[in-house]
């Protein structure tokens, strides 16, 4: 492929060499530079790819894509393409390099503070029940046919995303459903194609910091970029930020929510509380004459489960899907580490969730309180080498909203777990919350199970889908589900 053929969709200038050069491969990782490749110099948070420009020339790269001046050997015949933003350019270059696979797929993108992961799996579940072949890209994993690829980022770099699209097309996928993080939008990872449908779930202050968004206004603005890059936007009418997020949109808009003015809304909401299980049941109604309501049940608790299901239903209305297929798919849906119920006993309920900050823990505990448990038991730790404020806040939230807290270890990283636990205790001591600290996570879970009372709800929070514990730079195998299974087996053997 000639260099020029990769340079469509953005402005560029050839400042050295010849844009007609043949390109054998496209790379953005300096460790993968090969003779004849195009090396895209990306400004990362820790490493600037421009510092490897000279090395690329020496290794025989055919072309560089840069956004600032670079030093090159004077004898090198390398081609240099100057652009305003090399990340933006990389998205278009990657799409061209892989043959624009998204043009032959219907790509559905979901953005929002909460609900992205669950909504992607619900959409995938419904569409597959209706006979479609669906790829998925998200926080937990990328799914291509039978392959499950663990995720590094919620939204992969544009090159990897386009590679996934190509592989999904080759696998025979019709549709791709993906989480679209605000950071991914900010860094242009989803440029180079147009989404068939964009969904907005909700917005709350989060991901504000030196490595993410400067302030809430930037966070909001980045979410809104999705609605200038899709044909149809489906948004939560009930969220206070919806108008701001969709300001300047270039797509048609539809709404979902509990508000009866939404295009699709929930009515007659009922909590489902069965032995060892929690869920929610509601009627789905659509505005317009002749639309007959139908009932769905979701095996996940809380109002946010209604919103996640409504978003999925609203999307699937644009495909050939029967109501009965929606009902069956939702009833059987489960998302790993997202209010995931683990069958342990019909006397109490045990859930695993990824809630790892004060906001998500408060939302979860408030939701579970609606089910009137005998006790609401919260078990969690906090990650090391992260904000200490998060520890104080999570301790205070658990002390205020749970009846009993079991403080334990999460991913201590390079800190001592006992020090992290002390920080959490500082937060909980601001409340009258009863608590115990057990550093070993398996022992902590065993304690919570052994002390459970009939009607209790126990939430094991923080790690969710993770299957490791990070200590001193090493990730050791650890999965809350496996720990629970081991504990139950040990109890059974003890008689």
Q: Where are these predicted regions, by residue range?
A:
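ATP-dependent carboxylate-amine ligase
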Residues: 1-14, 35-38, 250, 289, ...
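N-terminal leader/targeting and accessory segments in enzymes
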Residues: 1-92, 228, 240, 262-270, ...
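Acidic, Mg2+-coordinating active-site environments of NTP-dependent enzymes
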Residues: 3, 10, 70-76, 171, ...
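Phosphate-binding loop of NTP-binding sites
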Residues: 10, 90-233, 237, 241-249, ...
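Alpha-helical segments flanking ligand/cofactor-binding loops in enzyme cores
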Residues: 31, 54, 125, 166, ...
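Short glycine-rich anion-binding loops that position phosphate/pyrophosphate groups of nucleotides
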Residues: 44-46, 182-183, 204-207, 239-240, ...
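Structural beta-sheet core signal
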Residues: 136, 178, 198, 235, ...
């Amino acid at each position: 492929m000639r260099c020029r053929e990769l340079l469509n969709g953005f402005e560029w200038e050839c400042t050295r060499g010849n844009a007609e050069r043949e390109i054998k491969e496209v790379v953005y990782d300096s460790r993968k530079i090969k003779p004849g490749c195009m090396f895209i110099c990306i400004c990362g948070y820790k490493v600037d790819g421009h510092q490897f420009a000279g090395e690329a020339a020496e290794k025989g790269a055919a072309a560089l894509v840069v956004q600032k001046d670079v030093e090159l050997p004077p004898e090198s015949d390398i081609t240099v393409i100057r652009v305003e933003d090399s990340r933006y350019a990389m998205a278009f270059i990657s799409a061209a390099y892989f043959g624009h696979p998204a043009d032959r797929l219907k790509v559905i993108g979901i953005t929002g503070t909460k609900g992205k992961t669950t909504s992607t799996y619900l959409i995938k579940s419904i569409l597959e029940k209706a006979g479609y072949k669906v790829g998925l890209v998200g926080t937990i994993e990328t799914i291509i046919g039978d392959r499950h690829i663990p995720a590094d980022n919620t939204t992969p770099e544009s090159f990897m995303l386009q590679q996934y699209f190509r592989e999904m097309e080759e696998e025979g996928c019709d549709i791709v459903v993906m989480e679209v993080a605000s950071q991914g939008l900010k860094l242009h990872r989803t440029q180079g194609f147009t989404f068939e449908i964009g969904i907005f779930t909700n917005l709350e202050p989060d991901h504000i910091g030196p490595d993410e968004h400067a302030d809430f206004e930037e966070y909001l603005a980045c979410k809104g970029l999705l609605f200038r890059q899709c044909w149809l936007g489906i948004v939560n009418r009930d969220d206070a930020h919806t108008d701001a997020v969709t300001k300047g949109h270039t797509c048609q808009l539809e709404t979902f929510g509990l508000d009866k003015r939404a295009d699709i809304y929930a009515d007659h909401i009922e909590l489902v509380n069965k032995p060892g299980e929690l869920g929610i049941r509601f009627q789905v109604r659509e505005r317009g004459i002749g639309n007959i309501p139908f009932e769905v049940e979701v095996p996940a608790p809380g109002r946010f489960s209604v919103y996640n299901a409504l978003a999925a239903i609203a999307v699937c209305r644009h495909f050939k899907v029967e109501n009965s297929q929606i009902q069956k798919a939702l009833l059987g849906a489960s998302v790993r580490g997202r209010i995931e119920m683990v069958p342990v006993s019909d006397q109490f309920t045990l859930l695993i969730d990824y809630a790892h900050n004060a906001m998500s823990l408060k939302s979860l505990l408030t939701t579970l309180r609606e089910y009137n448990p005998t006790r609401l038991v919260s078990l969690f730790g906090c990650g090391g080498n992260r904000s200490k404020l998060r520890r104080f806040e999570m301790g205070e939230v658990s002390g205020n909203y749970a009846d009993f807290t079991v403080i334990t270890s999460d991913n201590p990283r390079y800190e001592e777990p006992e020090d992290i636990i002390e920080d959490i205790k500082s937060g909980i001591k601001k409340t009258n919350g009863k608590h115990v600290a057990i550093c070993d996570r398996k022992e902590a879970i065993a304690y919570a199970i052994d002390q459970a009372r009939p009607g209790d709800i126990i939430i094991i929070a923080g790690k969710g889908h993770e299957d490791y514990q990070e200590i001193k730079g090493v990730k050791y195998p650890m999965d809350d589900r496996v720990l629970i299974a081991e504990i139950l087996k040990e109890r059974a053997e003890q008689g």
